[in-house]
Amino acid sequence: MARAMAAAWPLLLVALLVLSWPPPGTGDVVVQAPTQVPGFLGDSVTLPCYLQVPNMEVTHVSQLTWARHGESGSMAVFHQTQGPSYSESKRLEFVAARLGAELRNASLRMFGLRVEDEGNYTCLFVTFPQGSRSVDIWLRVLAKPQNTAEVQKVQLTGEPVPMARCVSTGGRPPAQITWHSDLGGMPNTSQVPGFLSGTVTVTSLWILVPSSQVDGKNVTCKVEHESFEKPQLLTVNLTVYYPPEVSISGYDNNWYLGQNEATLTCDARSNPEPTGYNWSTTMGPLPPFAVAQGAQLLIRPVDKPINTTLICNVTNALGARQAELTVQVKEGPPSEHSGISRNAIIFLVLGILVFLILLGIGIYFYWSKCSREVLWHCHLCPSSTEHASASANGHVSYSAVSRENSSSQDPQTEGTR
């Protein structure tokens, strides 16, 4: 009998292969599933898998099977009469397959996703009369990283040092970190294994030469990862500790004796903030009429002893710095003319020019009129000259003498008394 069974096995295998071949004229029966499914480490994930059967097509599904590439045996099977069976019953579950129902949905849920679960899986439908249909799905296991950024507080060193730190912890795959800044600088990025197996922690340092100019400025850490819908931006406010930088303001180079008051301000920029201001002169203490009020020096009134070099010394936790200002007091207040504004001077000059132009026009018309009157009188004068003669009765009589004749004859004058 055993020999009979052994002889029957080849015939049985041929029969099974024949049953698995689709008969001629049957429509396309296909399995639908995404090529890749992402899942997060420690969470559950569903591998979708559906059988699409054309209308009016008679298809009988006898079994659903899931297998992983590179491993022998099946990880999950659902038989039409025997129900489900799993290689890990606590981690695997068919989502929709039920006894007594049509087996069209082979979707499989996996719980407690592990790094080693990443790989290629095959979903297979055993159908009749079409035969077996399958599709491959790649399961991508991700770990969403936690991101932080913090400032590295530094002092003036004159050398490049880390001034900001950005960390992306426990990512799978490793996160990508970049920096954005207008201050220059360069990144230094490193990776170490994360707390969970298969994860990576990425640390990036922003390196720059510290100075007072970058204190309080911002740099941005940009973190990109497959699990993010958009990059995460983390802003870091830089901190540089430095001693005071001091200057004195308020002197306009126009102080004079007897001026009611004047004020100077000691401008200091430092980190940490200044803790003290001290005013003095190069000759020693301040004169009595100069009163220090913190960052300000009130001078009331302005007198000759203030005609010196003033010193403001500022202190903070890192040291002390000072600034000097030389004051020269004038004998008297500015003249009134010095107070005339530029606009007033411009209007005054324009007024004088207009007056001179009008005066010139008036003189021109006056002389023009006089010249015309002189010419008119000359036109009325006769061409002959009159000569006076005395009459017999003692009266003087005049006779006209031609100018032409007067040139050849001497004038004759008669007179009787």
From Swiss-Prot:
Upregulation: Transcriptionally regulated by SHH.
Residues covered by region (DYNLT1 binding): 368-372
Span(s) of short sequence motif ITIM motif: 396-401
Endpoints of the signal sequence: 1-20
Gene Ontology terms: cellular component: adherens junction; cell surface; cytoplasm; extracellular space; focal adhesion; membrane; plasma membrane
Residue spans crossing the bilayer: 344-367
Domain Ig-like V-type: 24-139
Name recorded for this polypeptide: Poliovirus receptor
Organism for this UniProt entry: Homo sapiens
Name of the encoding gene: PVR
